[in-house]
Amino acid sequence: MPLIDMPLSKLKTYKGISPRPKDFDAFWARALKEMRGTDPRVELKPAAFQVPFADCFDLYFTGVRGARIHAKYLRPKKAAAPHPAVVQFHGYSGNCGDWSSKLEYVARGYSIAGLDCRGQGGESEDSGGVKG
């Protein structure tokens, strides 16, 4: 995306240069149907890492095709309900990062879930049953 050579008004409507696949809508209809038919089986386990101002958990849920997904979930101890949250995704060959890298968000009143994307360097499984 050309961040510096296009005015903001054009950036707001910019759609890239790759054509939209012909099966785009059908693909997403199938994917959403599969996701909605998946029982997430959410587990929230207290983490070994703890700090005085945050509750820290290992969060697990089942994604499509049965893969177990892991996230580091932290929330402020005195959080109002509802309150803002951040969902953090890492780049390829990475993982969700260290617990301490998420504390800044919690200190500002945000919950944060740092996901281990499937098939990468963390605890999540891919649909082939591989961890990491």
What does each model-identified segment do?
Residues 97, 103-132:
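Cap/lid segment of the alpha/beta-hydrolase catalytic domain
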Residues 28:
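Active-site-adjacent helical/loop segments in soluble small-molecule enzymes
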